């Protein structure tokens, strides 16, 4: 018998998560200079990292021989002050993915189910399957969550509902009132995980007061991350906010030192750097307008997005178009694993990166066999130039 046959069948059935292609990998494959490649595949911050966070992390290098504070006291204190919660309502994670996995480990067992939307974050089914749970994918409505259908899908064995707002990879946004009504209607015996990884990219008028809902709904867990607007994806820091009893259970099963010294120091400093987050938001607004304008000029359908990315429908052979982009040194994200085989997702980058993407896409559409020529206007496209400090 092969030793691997002893692993549970539900583990052996899992397909590994496929992240965006690294720049170094494409450089090796194509024999390219890494400096000539742009990566717009993983929703990373094109501005880099908060300078205050970088400074704090640099100082923390002197203590890498020591274990981190397993309780994350200073970061929890900073989060408590920022969000008006108590430290016992907080669970820290090695990125918000870690927090999602902790929720599954605590509340699921073989045969229990989770409910999530079609076209939602791939980690939801992964963490469900990893503990032997059953994932219920509810058909999307206009590429977003159909909350009424998701409520109907909740079964007696359902323990967790995942809601991404904004949603990745489609960028759709649920009005805060709709989410609140869902919380009021769903069974209090079901944990609702509200994944707000892209919250900082929302216009202020569209940000719901979800954290205030924690006082009313002990079955609500809100997850956020330092990977996106704070530009700290490489050091992996995320957090969850919930009822003290829920956070307490999750803290029982997390790894003792799941957030490292560097990440803890950087996150505390990043919370103080409000100017960097404002710049990230403004750049994203301007870049989104730049990309949307370019796609419109090419007659490309796209899904309006409230994140720092945009999914668009490719008129033709998606694989061939993506290969052409790669050969031109542009990495975007195929999203067939999200049941969107005709789409690609692009991260909003710097103005120059967005311009290179748009020009490369136009070339790919013009030169790739199988592209739908009737959707492609003349290729002498003048792409918009938008100042990085502007808004859309």
From Swiss-Prot:
Keyword Amino-acid biosynthesis annotated: yes
UniProt keyword annotations, A-Z: Amino-acid biosynthesis, Aminotransferase, Histidine biosynthesis, Pyridoxal phosphate, Transferase
EC number of the protein: 2.6.1.9
MF-aspect GO terms: histidinol-phosphate transaminase activity; pyridoxal phosphate binding
Needed cofactors: pyridoxal 5'-phosphate
Reactions it catalyzes: L-histidinol phosphate + 2-oxoglutarate = 3-(imidazol-4-yl)-2-oxopropyl phosphate + L-glutamate
Modification N6-(pyridoxal phosphate)lysine, positions: 228
Keyword Transferase (UniProt): yes
EC main group: transferase
PROSITE patterns on file: AA_TRANSFER_CLASS_2
SUPFAM superfamilies: PLP-dependent transferases
Pathway connected to this protein: Amino-acid biosynthesis; L-histidine biosynthesis; L-histidine from 5-phospho-alpha-D-ribose 1-diphosphate: step 7/9
BP GO annotations: L-histidine biosynthetic process
Domain of life per record: Bacteria
Subunit structure: Homodimer.
Family, per entry: Belongs to the class-II pyridoxal-phosphate-dependent aminotransferase family. Histidinol-phosphate aminotransferase subfamily.
Protein name, UniProt field: Histidinol-phosphate aminotransferase 2
Organism: Nitrosospira multiformis (strain ATCC 25196 / NCIMB 11849 / C 71)
Lineage per the UniProt record: Bacteria, Pseudomonadati, Pseudomonadota, Betaproteobacteria, Nitrosomonadales
Designated gene of the protein: hisC2
């Amino acid at each position: 018998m092969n030793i691997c046959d002893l692993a549970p069948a539900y583990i052996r059935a899992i397909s590994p998560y496929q992240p965006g292609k690294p720049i170094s990998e494409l450089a090796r494959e194509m024999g390219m200079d890494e400096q000539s490649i742009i990566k717009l595949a993983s929703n990373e911050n094109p501005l880099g990292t908060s300078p205050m966070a970088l400074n704090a992390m640099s100082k923390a290098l002197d203590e890498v021989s020591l274990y981190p504070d397993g309780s994350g006291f200073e970061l929890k204190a900073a989060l408590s002050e920022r969000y008006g919660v108590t430290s016992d309502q907080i669970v820290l994670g090695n990125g918000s993915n870690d927090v999602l996995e902790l929720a599954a480990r605590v509340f699921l067992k073989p045969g229990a189910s989770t409910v999530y939307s079609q076209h939602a974050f791939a980690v939801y089914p992964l963490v469900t399957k990893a503990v032997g749970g059953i994932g219920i994918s509810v058909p999307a409505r206009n590429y977003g969550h159909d909350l009424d259908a998701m409520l109907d899908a909740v079964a007696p064995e359902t323990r967790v509902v995942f809601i991404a707002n904004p949603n990745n990879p489609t960028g759709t946004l649920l009005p805060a009132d709709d989410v609140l009504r869902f919380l009021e209607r769903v069974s209090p015996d079901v944990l609702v995980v509200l994944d707000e990884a892209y919250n900082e990219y929302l216009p202020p008028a569209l940000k719901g007061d979800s954290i205030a809902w924690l006082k009313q709904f002990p079955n609500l867990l809100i997850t956020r991350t330092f990977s996106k607007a704070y530009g700290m994806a490489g050091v992996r820091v995320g957090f969850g906010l919930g009822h003290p009893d829920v956070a307490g259970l999750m803290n029982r099963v997390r790894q003792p030192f799941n957030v490292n010294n560097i990440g803890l120091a950087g996150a505390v400093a990043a919370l103080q750097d409000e100017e960097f987050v404002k710049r990230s938001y403004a750049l994203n607004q301007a870049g989104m307008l730049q990309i949307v304008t370019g796609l419109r000029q090419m007659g490309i359908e796209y899904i309006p997005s409230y994140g720092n990315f945009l999914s668009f429908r490719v008129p033709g052979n998606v694989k061939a178009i993506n290969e052409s982009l790669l050969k031109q040194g542009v990495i975007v994200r195929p999203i067939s694993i999200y049941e969107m085989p005709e789409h690609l997702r692009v991260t909003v980058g710097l103005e120059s990166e967005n311009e290179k993407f748009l020009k490369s896409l136009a070339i790919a559409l013009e030169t790739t066999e199988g592209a739908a020529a009737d959707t492609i206007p003349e290729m002498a496209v003048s792409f918009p130039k938008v100042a990085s400090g502007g808004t859309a």
